[in-house]
A protein has these predicted regions:
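Short, conserved beta-turn/loop elements at beta-strand boundaries and strand-helix junctions
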Residues: 171-174, 232-238
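Short beta-strand segments
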Residues: 63, 164, 183-187, 225, ...
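C-terminal boundary and immediately downstream tail of ABC-type ATPase nucleotide-binding domains
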Residues: 147-177, 202, 273
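Glycine/charge-rich catalytic "coupling/switch" loops of P-loop NTPases
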Residues: 147, 182-233, 257-284
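ABC ATPase nucleotide-binding domains
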Residues: 1-4, 8, 12-156
């Protein structure tokens, strides 16, 4: 079968050099061509000068490149990647992501990537398939899935934290009205759902914003909400801010310099706006 496979643990032959590992995928070629082809593929994945090293003489990222070169050397019709980047450090993983994207475009081959890493999936995928216990829950482009999950289960698997239950009150000319506890929120139209039904709804952390400074207008679908800061969690250049509103937990991300500018502190009450154009409702 013309299928290339790249495994999480690389599966390199420990007694063979990088060049010979790649050559193992070329046994259907004349012996005189194998080494030249193997060296060419190693060069394509930026392993020039490392052809004769054994796997234990290579870093994890270099071993991964050897395995990728071996998978591609057979010029497969499809490439299957089984969590191939989970065993390397972040900087190496980012470099491999870029190289894989370039190779995929160059060879125009379909790639099936199995991963638990949402960031990796959204970065590399043209289409995503959400699987749970052997069942397909939803397929589509990364943007479509993130903006319009079909169920709360899909939203949770996509890492969304702000998932709630509410009631779709009515449809207006350019928006719908959503009842959430004692608040009425204006959201983008959801005319496929009947007014009066109970719904699940989600808002991404990027859809929860600090109220703008005085004089800066919002949008027609901004929903001002008073919230209490429960916890500030440092994530490097930004904070994850855990909030509480009407007894419900709510999360947003705030850049570190913005948090410092607003002097955010745990326990204080602040005003945020829920961007109605980012709110997505689903049948309950």
């Amino acid at each position: 079968r013309r299928i290339g496979m790249l495994f999480q643990q690389f599966a390199l032959f420990p007694h063979l050099s990088a060049e010979d590992n790649v050559a193992e995928a070329l046994l259907d070629h004349p012996a005189t061509e194998r080494r030249a082809r193997a060296r060419d593929w190693l060069d394509r994945v930026h392993l020039q000068g490392l052809h004769h090293r054994l796997p234990h003489q290579l870093s994890g990222g270099q071993q991964q490149r050897v395995a990728l070169a071996r998978a591609l050397a057979r010029e497969p019709q499809v490439l299957l990647l089984d969590e191939p980047f989970s065993a390397v450090d972040r900087s190496t993983r980012e470099a491999l992501h870029a190289e894989l994207t370039e190779l995929r475009v160059a060879f125009r081959m379909p790639v099936i990537l199995v991963t638990h890493d949402l960031e990796e999936a959204t970065l590399l995928a043209d289409r995503m398939c959400i699987l749970n216990e052997g069942r397909t829950l939803q397929t589509g482009s990364p943007d479509h899935l993130l903006q319009s999950p079909e169920s709360a289960a899909v939203a949770r698997m996509l890492g969304m934290r702000n998932i709630f239950t509410g009631t779709l009150l009515a449809h207006e000319a350019d928006h719908s009205l959503l009842r959430w506890n004692d608040l009425t929120l204006k959201v983008r139209p959801h005319r496929h759902l009947p007014a009066g039904c109970e719904v699940k709804w989600v808002i991404p952390v990027s859809g929860v914003l600090l109220m703008p400074l005085a004089g800066r207008p919002g949008t027609p679908l901004d929903n001002p909400v008073s919230v209490r800061i429960q916890r500030l969690l440092s994530l490097g250049e930004q904070y994850r801010v855990n909030l509480e509103s009407t007894g419900q937990p709510l999360s947003m991300n705030v850049a570190r310099h913005v948090a410092q500018r607003y002097k955010l502190t745990e326990g204080e009450t602040i005003e945020v706006r829920l961007r109605g154009e980012t709110i997505h409702m689903m049948a309950n």
